[in-house]
Regions:
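Helical scaffold of the NTase/Pol beta-like nucleotidyltransferase catalytic core
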Residues: 1-29, 59-65, 258
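Short secondary-structure boundary/capping segments within folded domains
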Residues: 18-23, 37-42, 77
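Extended, basic/helix-rich recognition subdomains
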Residues: 166-223
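A generic structural motif
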Residues: 2, 52-58, 175, 193-194
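Structured mid-to-C-terminal alpha-helical surface segments
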Residues: 198-258
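Catalytic metal-binding acidic patch
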Residues: 29-70, 74, 84-91
Length: 258
């Protein structure tokens, strides 16, 4: 596990809140994502995944949401402040033999804060991204409560992983403007996964992809990687055309392999 003490404390605080609210329904909580793979970057979230054995009642959704709004930091994160938390809760029955796309019982992320502060409740969502999260989490997740990840997290068939990437592509590419760094790095990681079947960090995927790209597109992707690592300013004002060309190149590479 490569998270520092502050992030571990934040993950443990969130886990304690989840346990106190969901109580006997909670089977496990796992830490996954950057904290357990390549290390947390300046804007990385603390990614948590929980498994429950029964649907979450609205009253418990409200309590869990209130706790997460309090514990999670806001985006974009300032240096030294709490990190954003992303929590996905899955019903054990929904993932025992996963259908496509996988259904999440509850999702919290800072991109949804405005809606949640307007009193919207997290609701169950079926989304290709859920399938990809489970596939990657099974490979790397660390238990904060409950048994080893392979006890509950299913092995996602390769054809479902490929279908999830295919179905997630249009929305991902459409969100490029304003989220250039994340979209380009996610496309690079999709290319890597579609080519090899494995999951690696965004910065490692960018390095892998850039070595196989034309110089201009590679330079744009490297800029995204360096911004992700905190080495350069995350500024795309004068790189709109370059980011679009790079996204188009990466998208085509992914589609060729799916």
């Amino acid at each position: 596990m490569r998270a520092d003490r502050q992030q571990i404390d934040q993950a443990l605080a969130a886990t304690e809140a989840i346990r106190s609210i969901l109580r006997e329904a909670l089977l496990a909580v796992y830490l996954h994502g950057s904290a357990v793979s390549g290390g947390l970057r300046p804007q990385s979230d603390v990614d948590l995944l929980a498994i429950v054995d029964c649907p979450v009642a609205d009253e418990l959704r409200r309590d869990l949401l209130a706790a997460l709004l309090r514990i999670s930091g806001r985006h974009p994160r300032a240096v030294g402040t709490p990190r954003c938390i992303e929590l996905m809760v899955f019903l054990r029955a929904d993932i025992a033999t996963p259908n496509f796309p996988v259904r999440a019982e509850f999702i919290y992320g800072e991109w949804l804060r405005e809606a949640f502060e307007s009193e919207e409740l997290p609701v169950p969502v079926s989304d290709p991204e859920n399938t990809l999260v489970l596939a990657q989490a099974r490979q790397e997740a660390v238990p904060l409560f409950g048994p080893d990840a392979k006890e509950f997290l299913p092995s996602i068939p390769p054809e479902q992983v490929r279908r999830a990437m295919h179905d997630a592509l249009p929305l991902l590419v459409d969100s490029l403007q304003g989220d250039e760094r994340n979209v380009l790095l996610t496309l690079a990681r999709m290319w890597r996964t579609s080519a090899t079947g494995d999951f690696i960090t965004k910065d490692a995927a960018a390095t892998w992809a850039a070595n196989q790209m034309p110089d201009q597109e590679a330079g744009t992707l490297i800029h995204a990687r360096e911004a992700y690592l905190g080495n350069v300013r995350d500024d795309w004002e004068n790189r709109q055309s370059a980011s679009e060309r790079t996204a188009t190149f990466l998208r085509q590479r992914v589609l060729e392999l799916l």
